[in-house]
Amino acid sequence: MAIIEVYQRLEQPGAVAIDRKADASPLTEADLAAHRIIVDGLRALTPEWPVLSEEDADVPLAVRSGWSRFWLVDPLDGTKEFLSRNGEFTVNIALVENHRPIIGVVHVPVTGIDYFSIASVGAWKAQSADDSGSPIRVAPRSNIPLRVVGSRSHASARLTDALHALGSHELVSMGSSLKFCVLAEGAADVYPRMGPTSEWDTAAAHAIVQGAGGDVVRLDGAPLEYNRGSGWLNPDFIAVGPRDHDWVRLFSGVS
């Protein structure tokens, strides 16, 4: 795969071109190669559905407000993790319908693992391309202490305050949409995000959490939705697994 070819070349100093986007986040040739492969493939598969990728997201709201169904792609989620070579980066593909993700695929290039889901049907984890996948579910009840998963590269003072309010907990730091995936397979209880994310960062794994029996909501308890505004930034949100806590109330003091 194009991403792994570039990843292996990172061992050689200067062998991989790295640019900076307008927001100063890194952009590599792996991002662009994966973007081309995925977008071309989806357009060939479903030519009637628009495809929007992080690397080609400059579509006016006046155009996309008419999209009832579209593909939303992050060709390389976790570019900082990719560059640090810790393996915690993913490829995210979601089908969004009426502002909600209804199909999600998260591919982990280093391990070959795939997480995928279909709304109202379920979520699965496949260990390889030859594996048809096994069902995954969120944990039936919360662990004591609570297992919280958080960002490895984007910690914030607001998250620290929120975790302090939770009391006893175990924090696992992780990159990319893998945070949602460990929640979906029952290895964590909650993923609070108090910091910037874009819709392509979350849509695919959002679908997987929901397919596994969890949910993703804003801090006011409203559903996290897609393609609603002129930009692509998400509000702060909570991804939850077990339903044995009033998670919105627990995080209500975050401001």
Residue locations for each model-derived region?
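N-terminal subdomain of lithium-sensitive/metallo-dependent phosphomonoesterases centered on the IMPase/IPPase/PAP
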Residues: 1-76, 157, 161-164, 222, ...
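Acidic beta-strand-loop-alpha-helix segment within the catalytic core
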Residues: 93-181, 230-255
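Glycine-rich active-site/cofactor-binding loop and its immediate structural neighborhood
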Residues: 67-109
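Hydrophobic residues within well-ordered alpha-helices
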Residues: 148, 182-186, 203-210
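Acidic donor-binding loop at a coil-to-helix junction in glycosyltransferase catalytic cores
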Residues: 200
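Beta-alpha-beta core module
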Residues: 211, 215, 219, 223-240
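Alpha-to-beta junction loops
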Residues: 185-190, 214-215
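Buried hydrophobic positions in well-ordered alpha/beta secondary-structure cores of metabolic enzymes
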Residues: 3, 78-79, 148, 183
